[in-house]
Amino acid sequence: MYKVEDIKTVHLEVTQRCNAACPMCDRNENGGAVNQHIRGNLKELSLEDCKRIFPPEFIGQLNTMYMCGNLGDPIVAEDTLEIFRYFREHNPKMWLSMNTNAGARTTEWWQELASIFGRMGAVIFSVDGLENTNHLYRQGVVWEHVA
């Protein structure tokens, strides 16, 4: 039987919101409106939620924390940087990682994320094409923010 002490990796979905409307995503209806089954019920974890769910002693036992949404993108969540900072503060040696479409933040935001991650983290960018084709798959993504 597993115990809380055995948990070494957390996959955290901080938001169900997304800046994109990708046709292949279950979050929306064929690249259009938000799926009727989640519309009006889009939620987001705040820094305070994460502090309540993940006490410092629990964070201290982790090796890895990933942010990747099934229905959202962590870059649109209000407290993403603060949540990463909280995890880093309580475990400087853990690996931090995030998957994103990359199309919703400024250079300054990315620089702040890099300073939190340091050499113990990575961002996986989901870019599906070049400037003239990415929008076919990642609808709603601002190419200038990606490039």
Please identify what each model-predicted range represents:
Residues M1-A122, T133-H145:
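Conserved alpha-helical substructure of the radical SAM core
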Residues V127-E131:
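A glycine-centered beta->alpha junction motif in the catalytic cores
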